[in-house]
Structures are given as C-alpha cells and as structure tokens.
Design a protein with these regions (language model features):
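N-terminal membrane-anchoring alpha-helices
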Residues: 1-40
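Active-site beta->alpha N-cap acidic-glycine motif
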Residues: 26-113, 119, 123, 130, ...
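Hydrophobic, well-structured mid-protein blocks that either form specific transmembrane helices
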Residues: 114-149, 153-156
Length: 241
C-alpha cells in the first residue's frame, strides 16, 4: 500500500493512497466516535439525532420522503449528487423551501480514490455551485461516496468551503432483500444519543426498489423517536446549544 502525506485526525492517520473506508461497518465501530473527531463522525454531545439521506435527488422517490417529513414536521439533511441536482432543479428547490438542509455528495457517485485531487476539487466546487444557485443558500457539508476518506478529499472539501461529515449509524438500506424491520433494527443497534443516521432516498446506487423499504423504515423510526421525545433534525441543528 502506498503511503504519502497524512492527516492525523483524533488519532486516525489518513494517508494519501491509504484511504479510510468508513463504509465498512466493523471499521466504523472501531473508529467512530472513539478515534474520529466527533464532528467528522457526526456525533454531538446532545440527545439530538441528525437525520441524513444520500444519493438524490430522485423524482421517482425523493418526493415520498419529503411528504413524510412534512407530515411529521421534521427537517433533514440531504446529500445530493450534482449530476442529478442540475437535472432536477424544481425538486432541489422544493427541498430547500421545505426547510431541509442540502449538502454535497459529489458530482457523481465515484469513490474519491478513483478521482485525482484536481478532479475531485473541481467536482465539489461544481456541485456546491449548482446547489447554492438553485437554493440561494450557502452549502456547508460534504459527505464522500461510500464514506471513503483520503487526505486529498478532506483538503478538497475544505478548499471548497465544506466541512466533511460521515455518520454514526446506518440502516444498510441499499442492500437487496432488506425489510423495513431489518433497517430499523440496524439503525437502532448502532445509534447512540447525539448520533447521525445515514439512509438513502433513492435506489440509484442501491438495490432496485430499496427506497420503498427505506421510506417505511423512516416512518417507523420517526414514530419511535417521537414516542421517546427525541429531537430529530438536520446537521445544522446538531451542534447547537
């Protein structure tokens, strides 16, 4: 494995050519939040849960999530891919007008390891520009596809004025054959107070039709959190207070 310049983050060394693959759950359990900085792992000191969705916008599925969140009066953070945002301007505007926070997920869903530093930096700036032009609001967050971190990804995000944030619990909802109950169980098992949840509002990079399972699971999770009087919202509210 090649080595190169490295960034030491809370004890974790992220070397160029030696990416930290945060999407591998055993590794995440070992690193988050024990090793990764709280902000990077999406962990706050409050009981607030940050609800986040990746890979949209998708006109075939995202509206269902927006409708559900509107019914429950809940806002979330959506990490968008630039190629789809530019193709669905009305949907992006609807997200923003509903009070949801919008972050950068990249121009496409390519792993950052496959992009050179300059290409990645250009992609992030282009995606941020599209989102900000459509929403007329500043964009703050970046989440790399697959949760793969490299030093050049962190540097590119910072140069674009973005803060990188991962997640502390997920539903593995992109997998084929998952039930809503399984997604809920997986989220609940990994979630702690102050955590950030990762789900997907589209099946563009997931198993076909998986978004329907995620939508049902999201409804059940919102019900459970409401019963426990746990505040749920976007990352913008996660470190407030």
């Amino acid at each position: 494995m090649r080595t190169g310049s490295a960034l030491v983050a809370g004890g974790a060394v992220l070397a160029a050519g030696a990416p930290l693959v945060a999407s591998l759950q055993p590794l995440r359990r070992a690193l988050t939040p024990a090793v990764l900085p709280d902000r990077l792992s999406g962990v706050s000191t409050s009981r607030h849960i940050a609800l986040t969705f990746d890979d949209g916008p998708d006109p075939g599925s995202t509206p269902g999530f927006l409708d559900l969140l509107a019914e429950r009066d809940v806002r979330a953070t959506f990490f968008l891919l630039g190629r789809y945002a530019v193709a669905e301007p009305a949907l992006v505007r609807r997200m923003a007008e509903a009070g949801h926070e919008i972050g950068v997920h990249g121009w496409t869903h390519r792993c950052v390891v496959r992009l050179g530093p300059r290409r990645l930096a250009d992609d992030l700036r282009a995606t941020k520009r599209v989102i900000e032009e459509l929403t007329e609001r500043p964009t703050r967050w970046y989440r790399p596809p697959y949760g793969v971190l490299t030093t050049h990804a962190l540097v590119a995000a910072r140069s674009a004025g973005l803060s990188t944030v991962l997640w502390s619990a997920w539903g593995a909802d992109w997998r084929r054959g998952r039930s809503a109950a399984q997604v809920v169980t997986t989220v609940t098992r990994g979630l702690r107070p102050g955590g950030t949840v990762l789900l997907h509002d589209t099946d563009r990079t997931s198993a076909p039709g998986s978004w329907r399972t995620t939508l049902t699971a999201t409804e059940r999770l919102l019900d459970a959190w409401a019963e426990r009087d746990i505040a749920v919202g976007p990352l913008a509210e996660h470190w407030v207070g």
